[in-house]
């Protein structure tokens, strides 16, 4: 829901009411003649347990919880006499050391009058108090706050702040101060005394001139690493450290806050405002920082403007240097109250921030920052990070106090801000959806295991019933009789006699003891007598099985049988279990039977569904053999109870449930309530403190019997929801069932879920939070990882780190690595830290080098990248990436790793990379089609560069690329005979490329043959890469491609050449070689060729100006070469 759909409302708290005596006191304070009341707007408050109201010279206090059995009678206590207005800020109600009639702490109360007269009740039930006149130097008390609860005979301690800014510590006086309530007052910190007498003497006799400060309007304490007290006055904001104790820092409004307020006015007026005045109103802690409410005025406005500023958490340790965030508070309603000529608005505004709102990192699901006035309340909704706000404006909402009502007080609790009004009672200030009705009261029926305690008078009845159970279900052998008597003696608290009776059994092997105990317990839970009430019988079984567990534990039998193998026959099938499973099964079978009985008797629909279920259960062969016909008789056979949920789940089959929608949903709800009831009762039994804790073994009895039907029902619910025939209310109800039902299935399963299908379906149905809760609870790592991969980086990584710690024993870290690698999320995998992840990445070189770079292990990364580049035979782009990164890492290595091998590898393979990049796309498409990223060997590059091209220019460039490649390789391997042979073969291919029978003269060699054009290219063409001003192939490198023996090359040529052709070819090669020798002697600057298209506008102009000079320089260079050539000729 967006902020536009929210409205601020006064939500009535119906559970809190004013007692009759309090209402009478309100009436007594009403003056009919003047049509006004003496009740002030700061005379009432409350906390989590109590409410209190000041009325004239007394205080009323009563419990918040409304009792339906009796009227609320408040406690009345007398207040100290005062000539100044009282305030609940000087009242503290806390949990005292005394206990009331219901064993709960009886509240203590501390009241301080404005003049400093203290009254302290350690218990309101005693009505006795201690009164002391505090030495506060004639200052006026402003606020009292509790600092320490009473403990070890010491009274509670308090902090008292005066309107002059002085802080006093009130702590217990005497060794028994917790009972007497005696307190002593000590000044802790504050300004120099500014009491009434001091100010009067200063006026009469003069004194040292000091800058005066205004009176404190509010103060509060904040516990962080230190106990801080913040005092707010219109002109100064001060923070004291109580542990030092001293003033931590102080900020003057005029110097620190007023310039910020002036900037708002300047933005409005578009010029510098005149006579700007700012006044601090209130402050509160918000997101560890300090939120401050400020009022501001200027000359051209007749209103008081409201502003909020926020300072970061550094305020708790040092003086702030600036404001982090600030905003205007638009007070558009009740504008008459904000007149500049009326200063009362400053004292009638209160900043209220509940604890949960203050600690929340975002505004969602909070009521915002609330400002209260006797006539209205506003909320500022700040849905952004104050340090880095993304939205320029905050949400503002307003609500008016009912016009005929009167504000009595307010209270800031953990979740809400409460206001107490004369007529309307107590309400919370809530930011709710627009048009939202009064909150409905939802009650959650909890399944509670009944008490297992039995009084002395009850045991004879249980003992008689136990004898019937043993007699009907067990043979009369000495062992069973001894176990029976021993348990009877234990129940009657004759422990020694019980142990003596048990000696014969103790001497038996553990497995035999487990067998006897198992048969004894099953005789109890499978006992049934039609003369007994079902619920009474179930309660007896519950008590007896619980007490037997205690009996086994006390007698040392429990530890012996808990791991003993045990065979239990059910329906003719032998199930192998251990003693611990058997003990848990017995208790939980009784609990499940109780849950089924409770469900069956709750309403008629459930009873009808139960009848349909029992009819099918009675036809099961195992049940038929017992001859049971009474539908309720099965409750006496707890050993068969697992058939009921299984058959109940079958009732949801399409061919059983029926086509009528209303009937179908009735059966759905009935079955789901049954399964949920069984689940809740079993879980409650496992958590019950009155039973012996039994460890849950991997294969539990529920998994072997009926747990799978819970998954079946969950899948049927999902199928029903997908059909879309259910209403919104039915859909919500079914979703609630599926959470409970599937939670039980997962808890009983012996395998850890992984990407569970039902959980994925729940996410798709709009229950991701609940699905994640189940996935986290039952360690479905696949679902957890899959879901959080869709969140932002911060949330995802924070959650993964939390899971690594939470599931350390389950090795979530390695699961995460495998999942991310398997699903191609290498980006997330590389964000994981730790030595185990490093070891994992060592198995994957393509990931390992990234981690090594991140850890600044550049030497290791270079070696890894080199091996990857050497092994890459398919993708040229990957080869380039690996080779380039290997070189850069090697150059950056400072960890002592020997990277000479990497540098040598780069030197050898760099020519291949460089020349593969220069092969035109047209040639690559001919070679590989659309696979332009294919790797090419040196032979492939030579072959395709020398292939027949569409024109002579392309052919020349192809041979140039081939010779350039060979030249670069020969520079790396100068002694390679194989490269020299390839150079000769390339010259042979160049000569054979032409039809020499068409060449008639030496001039034709230059103009008509590829050989001649290539020779001309060697001495006259020096192209450069785009953006480079120097040629890609310099003369000194071009000299390397000359054949070692031109005669041999020409002899091997297949061209139809004559003697003249051969002499022309040799002459050409000789002339080119001489020209290249001369060019090689020239400096590199002689080949500078600026790219006129790749420079900026200023450089362009400069180069255009020098263009003619550079052209003349180039021409002189060419003329010089021609003259030298003519002279040699």
Swiss-Prot record:
One of its GO terms (cellular component) is kinetochore. It is found in: Nucleus envelope; Nucleus, Nuclear pore complex. GO terms for molecular function: structural constituent of nuclear pore. Transmembrane segments: none annotated. The keyword Protein transport applies. One of its GO terms (biological process) is poly(A)+ mRNA export from nucleus. Keywords: Developmental protein, mRNA transport, Nuclear pore complex, Nucleus, Protein transport, Translocation, Transport. Important for early nematode development. Belongs to the nucleoporin Nup133 family. PANTHER family: NUCLEAR PORE COMPLEX PROTEIN NUP133. This is Nuclear pore complex protein 15. The lineage of its organism: Eukaryota, Metazoa, Ecdysozoa, Nematoda, Chromadorea. The gene is npp-15.
């Amino acid at each position: 829901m967006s902020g536009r759909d929210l409205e601020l409302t006064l939500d009535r708290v119906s559970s809190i009411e004013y007692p009759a005596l309090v209402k009478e006191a309100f009436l007594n304070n009403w003056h009919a003649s003047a049509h006004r009341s003496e009740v002030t707007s700061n005379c009432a408050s409350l906390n989590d347990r109590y409410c209190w109201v000041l009325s004239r010279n007394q205080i009323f206090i009563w419990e918040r919880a409304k009792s339906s059995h009796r009227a609320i009678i408040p406690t009345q206590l007398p207040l100290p006499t005062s000539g100044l207005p009282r305030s609940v800020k000087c009242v503290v109600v806390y949990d005292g050391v005394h206990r009331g009639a219901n064993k709960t702490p009886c509240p203590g109360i501390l009241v301080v009058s404005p003049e400093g007269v203290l009254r302290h009740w350690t218990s309101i039930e005693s009505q006795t108090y201690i009164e002391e006149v505090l030495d506060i130097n004639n200052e006026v008390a402003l606020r009292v706050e509790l600092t320490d609860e009473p403990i070890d005979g010491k009274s509670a301690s308090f902090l008292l702040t005066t309107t002059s800014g002085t802080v006093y510590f009130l702590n217990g006086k005497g060794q028994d101060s917790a009972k007497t309530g005696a307190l002593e007052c000590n000044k802790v910190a504050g300004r120099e005394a500014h009491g009434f007498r001091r100010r009067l003497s200063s006026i009469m006799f003069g004194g040292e001139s000091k800058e005066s400060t205004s009176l404190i309007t509010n103060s509060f304490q904040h516990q962080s690493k230190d106990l801080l007290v913040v005092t707010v006055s219109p002109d100064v904001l001060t923070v004291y450290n109580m542990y030092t104790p001293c003033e931590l820092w102080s900020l003057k409004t005029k110097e620190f806050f007023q310039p910020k307020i002036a900037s708002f006015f300047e933005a409005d007026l578009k010029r510098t405002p005149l006579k700007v005045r700012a006044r601090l109103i209130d402050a509160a802690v918000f997101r560890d920082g300090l939120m401050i409410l400020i009022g501001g005025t200027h000359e051209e406005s007749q209103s008081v403007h409201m502003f909020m500023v926020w300072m970061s958490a550094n305020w708790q340790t040092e003086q702030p240097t600036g404001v982090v965030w600030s905003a205007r508070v638009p007070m558009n309603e009740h504008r008459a109250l904000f007149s500049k000529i009326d200063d009362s608005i400053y004292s009638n505004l209160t900043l209220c921030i509940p604890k949960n709102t203050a600690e929340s990192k975002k505004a969602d699901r909070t009521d915002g920052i609330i400002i209260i006035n006797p006539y209205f309340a506003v909320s500022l909704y700040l849905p952004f990070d104050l340090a880095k706000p993304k939205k320029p404006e905050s949400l503002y909402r307003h609500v008016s106090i009912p016009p005929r009502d009167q504000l009595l007080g307010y209270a800031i609790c953990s979740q809400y801000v409460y206001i107490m009004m004369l007529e309307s009672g107590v309400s919370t200030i809530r930011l709710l959806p627009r048009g939202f009705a009064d909150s409905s009261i939802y009650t959650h029926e909890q399944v509670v295991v009944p008490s297992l305690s039995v009084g002395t008078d009850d045991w004879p009845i249980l003992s008689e019933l136990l004898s019937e159970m043993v007699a009907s279900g067990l043979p009369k052998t000495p062992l069973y009789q001894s176990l029976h008597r021993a348990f009877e003696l234990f129940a009657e608290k004759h422990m020694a006699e019980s142990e003596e009776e048990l000696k014969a059994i103790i001497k038996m092997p553990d497995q035999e003891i487990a067998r006897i105990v198992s048969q004894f317990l099953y005789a109890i839970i499978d006992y049934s007598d039609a003369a007994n009430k079902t619920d009474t019988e179930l309660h007896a079984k519950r008590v007896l099985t619980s007490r037997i567990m205690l009996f086994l534990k006390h007698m040392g039998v429990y530890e012996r049988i808990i791991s003993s193998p045990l065979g239990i026959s059910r329906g003719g099938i032998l199930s192998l279990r251990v003693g611990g499973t058997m003990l848990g099964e017995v208790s939980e079978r009784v609990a499940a039977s109780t849950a089924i009985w409770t469900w069956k008797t709750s309403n008629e629909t459930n009873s009808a569904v139960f009848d349909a279920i029992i009819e099918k259960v009675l036809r099961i062969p195992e049940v038929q053999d017992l001859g049971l016909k009474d539908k309720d008789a099965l409750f006496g056979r707890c050993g068969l109870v697992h058939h009921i949920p299984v058959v109940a789940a079958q009732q949801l089959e399409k061919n059983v449930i029926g086509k009528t929608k209303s009937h179908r949903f009735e059966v759905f709800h009935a079955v789901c309530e049954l399964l949920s009831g069984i689940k809740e009762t079993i879980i409650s039994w496992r958590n019950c403190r009155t039973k012996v804790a039994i460890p849950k073994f991997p294969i539990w009895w529920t998994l072997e019997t009926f747990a799978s039907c819970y998954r079946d029902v969950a899948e049927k619910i999902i199928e029903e929801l997908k059909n879309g025939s259910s209403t919104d209310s039915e859909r919500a109800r079914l979703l609630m069932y599926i959470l409970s039902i599937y939670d039980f299935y997962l808890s009983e399963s012996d395998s850890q879920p992984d990407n569970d299908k039902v959980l994925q379906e729940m996410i798709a149905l709009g229950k991701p939070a609940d699905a994640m809760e189940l996935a986290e609870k039952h360690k479905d790592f696949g679902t957890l990882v899959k879901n959080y991969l869709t969140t932002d980086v911060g949330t995802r990584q924070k959650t993964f780190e939390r899971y690594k710690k939470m599931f350390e024993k389950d090795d979530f870290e390695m699961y995460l690595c495998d999942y991310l690698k398997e699903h191609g999320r290498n980006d997330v995998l590389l964000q994981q830290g730790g030595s185990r992840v490093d070891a994992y990445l060592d198995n994957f070189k393509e990931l390992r080098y990234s981690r090594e770079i991140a850890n600044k292990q550049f030497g290791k990364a270079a070696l890894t990248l080199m091996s990857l580049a050497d092994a890459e035979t398919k993708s040229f782009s990957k080869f380039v990436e690996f080779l380039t990164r290997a070189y850069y890492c090697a150059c950056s290595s400072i960890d002592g790793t020997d990277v000479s091998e990497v540098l040598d590898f780069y030197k050898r393979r760099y020519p291949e990379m460089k020349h593969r990049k220069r092969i035109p796309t047209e040639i690559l498409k001919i070679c590989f089609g659309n696979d332009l990223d294919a790797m090419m060997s040196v032979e492939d590059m030579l072959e395709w560069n020398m292939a027949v091209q569409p024109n002579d220019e392309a052919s020349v460039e192809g041979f140039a690329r081939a010779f350039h490649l060979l030249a670069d390789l020969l520079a790396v391997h100068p002694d390679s005979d194989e490269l020299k042979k390839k150079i000769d073969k390339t010259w042979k291919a160049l000569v054979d490329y032409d039809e020499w029978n068409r060449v008639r003269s030496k001039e034709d060699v230059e103009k008509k043959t590829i050989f001649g054009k290539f020779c001309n290219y060697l001495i006259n063409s020096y192209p450069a890469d785009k953006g480079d001003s120097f040629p890609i192939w310099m003369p000194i490198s071009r000299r390397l491609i000359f054949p070692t023996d031109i005669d041999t090359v020409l002899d091997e040529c297949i061209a139809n050449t004559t003697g003249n052709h051969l002499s022309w070819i040799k002459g050409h090669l000789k002339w080119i070689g001489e020209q290249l020798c001369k060019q090689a002697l020239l400096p590199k600057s002689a080949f500078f060729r600026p790219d006129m298209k790749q420079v900026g506008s200023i450089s362009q102009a400069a180069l255009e100006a020098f263009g003619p000079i550079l052209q003349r320089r180039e021409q002189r260079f060419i003329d010089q070469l021609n003259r030298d050539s003519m002279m040699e000729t």
